[in-house]
Curated annotation (Swiss-Prot):
Protein name, per record: DNA mismatch repair protein MSH7
GO molecular function list: ATP binding; ATP-dependent DNA damage sensor activity; mismatched DNA binding
GO cellular component, one term: nucleus
Subunit and partners: Heterodimer consisting of MSH2-MSH7 (MutS gamma).
SUPFAM superfamilies per record: DNA repair protein MutS, domain I, DNA repair protein MutS, domain II, DNA repair protein MutS, domain III, P-loop containing nucleoside triphosphate hydrolases
InterPro entries: DNA_mismatch_repair_MutS-lik_N, DNA_mismatch_repair_MutS_C, DNA_mismatch_repair_MutS_core, DNA_mismatch_repair_MutS_N, DNA_mismatch_repair_MutS_sf, DNA_mmatch_repair_MutS_con_dom, MutS, MutS_con_dom_sf
Lineage summary: Eukaryota, Viridiplantae, Streptophyta, Embryophyta, Tracheophyta
Keywords: ATP-binding, DNA damage, DNA repair, DNA-binding, Nucleotide-binding, Nucleus
Gene name of this polypeptide: MSH7
Amino acid sequence: MQRQRSILSFFQKPTAATTKGLVSGDAASGGGGSGGPRFNVKEGDAKGDASVRFAVSKSVDEVRGTDTPPEKVPRRVLPSGFKPAESAGDASSLFSNIMHKFVKVDDRDCSGERSREDVVPLNDSSLCMKANDVIPQFRSNNGKTQERNHAFSFSGRAELRSVEDIGVDGDVPGPETPGMRPRASRLKRVLEDEMTFKEDKVPVLDSNKRLKMLQDPVCGEKKEVNEGTKFEWLESSRIRDANRRRPDDPLYDRKTLHIPPDVFKKMSASQKQYWSVKSEYMDIVLFFKVGKFYELYELDAELGHKELDWKMTMSGVGKCRQVGISESGIDEAVQKLLARGYKVGRIEQLETSDQAKARGANTIIPRKLVQVLTPSTASEGNIGPDAVHLLAIKEIKMELQKCSTVYGFAFVDCAALRFWVGSISDDASCAALGALLMQVSPKEVLYDSKGLSREAQKALRKYTLTGSTAVQLAPVPQVMGDTDAAGVRNIIESNGYFKGSSESWNCAVDGLNECDVALSALGELINHLSRLKLEDVLKHGDIFPYQVYRGCLRIDGQTMVNLEIFNNSCDGGPSGTLYKYLDNCVSPTGKRLLRNWICHPLKDVESINKRLDVVEEFTANSESMQITGQYLHKLPDLERLLGRIKSSVRSSASVLPALLGKKVLKQRVKAFGQIVKGFRSGIDLLLALQKESNMMSLLYKLCKLPILVGKSGLELFLSQFEAAIDSDFPNYQNQDVTDENAETLTILIELFIERATQWSEVIHTISCLDVLRSFAIAASLSAGSMARPVIFPESEATDQNQKTKGPILKIQGLWHPFAVAADGQLPVPNDILLGEARRSSGSIHPRSLLLTGPNMGGKSTLLRATCLAVIFAQLGCYVPCESCEISLVDTIFTRLGASDRIMTGESTFLVECTETASVLQNATQDSLVILDELGRGTSTFDGYAIAYSVFRHLVEKVQCRMLFATHYHPLTKEFASHPRVTSKHMACAFKSRSDYQPRGCDQDLVFLYRLTEGACPESYGLQVALMAGIPNQVVETASGAAQAMKRSIGENFKSSELRSEFSSLHEDWLKSLVGISRVAHNNAPIGEDDYDTLFCLWHEIKSSYCVPK
């Protein structure tokens, strides 16, 4: 096969001249020009006039970090023939006998001239900093000091496109670091502090008792400084936000800081650079670039010392607390802080020292906050396969409508470059808001600090604590005008946001029910991302509408928690959850799609069957399953790589400093190479499946696929980029980037992105294959039987004269899929029959099941298994049973377990009633309702009354499929003969015991876990109490009390005993007869319908009481 020519062969290669300056290939030198100038340090003898001067070199090799232990002091390179100065008539210097250790002779023929690579002289201006004005001097005892002034400057590029330099005033003399001290090589940081020598105390001999002094830059006076006096405006008792509000003020903004103007004016240039940014980003850990080091100051330094165990120093004027890390370790440090939930920013130098020299003297190296990373916006590093979402929520009250609250929301996956926006209506239970939070599973939630109700804040705290990792809740100050609908539209249009979206942002928003509140939430998200310097994400991101419930089986947040869909109730982890059971996906995109499908089970019979067809084909053809798995293992995270590639088109990388910009370009080369090779594996998979004609035909019905072969096919298009990668970036995994490579990469990416929509379709198709293959693996590897469900449409009410088809739920051999015992023993299978049979000979079963049984008998497990079977079926997955027939379920409601919410002030019974109220308000005929021990959170009589009334309402008014588990045994007698209720119980048995046991507990209770006809006579709570370890004496007392209460309370239910012989069915007959008799009593003619009614009643009575011979 002839090798495909590179797509770049049609373009003329750019020359070096045309590409010069696009990407700087020079690494940022340690220059350190901003870290602090080179200073002359003068050492004097404590007992003589002789003094020796030596300059501290600022070469790259001599720059040191503050987080490393003291090392051997670097020695100054002096010109050949250098001799220390001696004072006439005085003894030798105190250091004269060891000066040879600090002096290294320069053998180069430089005529005694100092190298000017690291030192740039300045003129005597306000920006000049004399060494003796800044660095403490070692004075002789007679006070004489030899002075040799050297001034220094910093330079950089003359023009910086799209870069706003941090405003600084250059008229304040001082060092070039926020630590208020110049960076200098260390003699255990002796040069950081001025040492005053006395005859009775020499600091070198007693270094543990040094006295730190402050050299006044103006008058040169020395004065002792107490720790913390320089930054009293940072102390907790004095700190204020930008509006001068204290932390106890409800409107206090913890993101900003007020710096007194007089203090800011006295700061040096670099200090102003740092604090002007920090005052607006107090919630961010800010790394400040100084030469070849990144440093943290004050509050951030404390955090670095605490979290990263870095050594903290008290360096600089005012004893500024400081920690630091070298360039090589910054990425690892940032990832550690992100993993612990911190937000991290980096203030970079925009020039190197060489560029600074080129601009001339009297210059300040400009710096800029170029990057802010947060746990919710991370796009690189170890972020895992799960989607990382940042969510913004806005709430408005709709008092005139049935649903009193509307929530607008917007969220983003920065790694995949995808936005979603939508709105939901909710009631006081906040069930819909809980569903949103469970579906999105955000890392961080932005909400209006004053516009969110107390109920919504409770829901935020409740549903964001269900997982094993904490979610950050970030209140956002309300800013009028920036987040209203009109203002947001203006911001999007004026800044060109979402220009790279495959769909217009107007289409995503305008179709929503409450688009204004959704736009407000989107505005909050945009403001936040702009603050984090993520303009590329906003400009190139795709935006889509998001529907929480529409077109799918509704599963609210509480139901997801009760059924343990994503997080277990033990430790909040994934073990023992539905997601974990079905997750056999190989690719990261498949894992994310699986979660999305579980949140949105289908409600369309045709779509469900299309998925089931592919699953059945996989289970029947193991070879296709194996081939698919082999290709999927080769795939990288194509979705995130495509987002990364899209964000690089016309990005802001050109304004980054040379070293950082080169690093970003190197990452882009690697990402582009990976995505091209990854799509090759993906397309090869689809082409291999085309040989399996049946599989590919099923896949085309399920997904939208672009043309793969032919002149316009993706296969030929992709091969051109493969050729370009092989020729121009053969070592793309670790390619050194030149100016020519940068322009080549830009051309390739722009051509590749032209078919971004088609690439997204390929990714979605491959992800669907991965998920459906995962379903097939779950069915194949299951320890119990798995069956393909038979799905019927939702029930449709017809005219009274026509037969009405109601909902059905018929599952035989049902078992809980992930309740397998440790020894591998399966749960006992059971049959669930609710509603009208569609395939049988017209048999009809009641839609409501009243379930009783002993504690620990398996009632809750059966309830959960039933719900999970419905979710399995409507996902398009095989169901853990022998056979399954169901009509579509529109909503699953659950009221399981007993729990209170102490932190939100809600008791167990209030939680029960709130969840039950949501069921009564929203349940329909096609819903599945699961109620477990309703009413146990209050007194016996109140609980029984509520359980009775709720059950009767759902049975007679809603007529939905329902499983109602209870320990109120009189309920079974109340509904014993009700035609729409069937009573069953979880069976148990007893085994005699030889040892002594309390009265009534002399037999062991054996749980059979099998669903059996009829009601259970007791709950056998005393036997369970013995099993739990309650002492025999206590149980015996309880047994006596139970017998007494039964005799007392039994009288109150005597009427129920009598009514069991005159059931609800008889009441219906009597009502019909009375109705007809009233018509006859009023001399009204008896119509044909009345005769039909009488005939039906006669037939029902005859069939009920006449036993066939």
